[in-house]
Amino acid sequence: APYQDKDFSTKTWNEGGYSDIDPYESYRAVFNGSLAMYQNPELIFSRGRNQGANSIAEMVKLQMPKTLGGGSNAYGMTQKMCDAYYMANGDEFSREHFKEEYPYGTRFVTKEEVEAGTYPQLKEGVYKEYANREPRFYASVSYNGCVWALLKNAETTDYKNDVEKQVNYYYGINTDGFSGTGVYLRSGIGIMKYVHPDDTNRKEIKAKAEPAIRFAEILLIYAEALNELEDGSSYDIASWDGSTSYSVKRDIDEMKKGIRQIRRRAGVPDYTMSEYQDRDVFRKKLKRERQIELMAEGPVSYTHLTLPTSDLV
């Protein structure tokens, strides 16, 4: 269930909250082929399946674990990107705070903790840095000790038992971790985004529409543009056909219209009022939001290059 924030958690989706949705499934279904392009109103522009040899389905084959999924372990995520994802309660991840909360010797999930359901997302032996993170983290990050569904393996002869398997990437594992074959994740962290539970290179990879431009990006652009307007200034912008005009200013209520839609679908609490009020703080928050929301999508790299500060998160 999404985090109980006494805001989004008290409202249904139609009321502006997330109490009746599964943010994890809602987010990953945009990318993993669960929805055909024509069924996905969030896609504003896509090349559909006309992606040639560089399709997203081909990319997913390279993301797959080598032994269990017949993939290549080719795409590693940086630690910086992994750390950017928020905690379930909306706090930023802090390694120093993690070390304080979990003293040495208590940082890996135990059998007893699994049986008690203390960390429902994690298996025994998994590092607790990956516990209690926001839904987009679990939809996007293939962390050490995560589970790959690979459900279509059940329809094969040789790999029918390789379903819902835990995968480790650490040194010394000669299957999906480090090995002398050259087929391993250099960073030790993989990418789960775009992967459907059925996907396996042993059987088939679902076709996936390319999210070239989607509504979430437009919402972020809108909030960013409003944030950069001078305080106290108002601008009249003509409509596309000149029939009317719109008065635009740095309006926090309007900025929220962009951010709150993204945060509630992601299952993460909204920003604080002080974060909306401070232009510089909001700019940094928005950059982080874009980094997370659009991870492994085309727009994010270009956007970060064009932002007016080099202080990238």
Please identify what each model-predicted range represents.
Residues 1-75, 79, 91, 95-310:
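Acidic/polar-rich alpha-helix caps and helix-coil junctions
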